[in-house]
Amino acid sequence: MQIADYFTEQDTMGRRRAKQVGVNYGVLRLPERSGFDLTSAEHWNAYLDGFRSDGIIPVVIEPLPNGLYDTVKCGLPGRDEAMYKLKKIVALMGRFHIPTLCLNFMAHVGWYRSRQNYPLRGGALGTAFDIKDYVPADDFAITQEQIWANMESFFREIVPVAEKYQVRLALHPDDPPVPALGNVGRVLTSLQSIDRAVTSWIAPC
């Protein structure tokens, strides 16, 4: 078993604290700032060095950078350029021996909660979701059928690259698992839908 924690570029104190309690592995979020070139091996090496110098071994990238990836999930203009960069990310993961990419296919609206301060036991607070409290931020619309088609196209291109560079693909379910948020469809909301995605487009290990 590998005990890992989730880290961002800014969380330098967090990874040092994690190391002190026995965490040796990291699930990393890639920088999305303008000065970081997602396709540059030099930039990747400098980013990863910060974790390695603290004794954290990168083992997972999660998620794909949303500025690029949502273009693919939603099938927007610029999709082909985004796919080129996403393939480069997978290739760089192979080069730097990061074995797993955790991705999702939540289009336009990602992980969502309607409350950030839901009362739990002992006075603790947690997050919560109630569909009646959801208010769309805009009028963007996409159907489940469109998302399935975009997902199929994405996997058709990304799986061969992942196989070539020996990068495993992990698929995160939609969270919350509801049929739609406003006019934005959700698809990975059940065991059956996840099985459809895995058996249809992801090559067996």
Question: What residue ranges belong to the model's regions?
Answer:
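Alpha-helical scaffolding within the catalytic cores
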Residues: 9-14, 194
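Structural motif corresponding to the early beta-alpha repeats
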Residues: 29-152, 156, 163-164
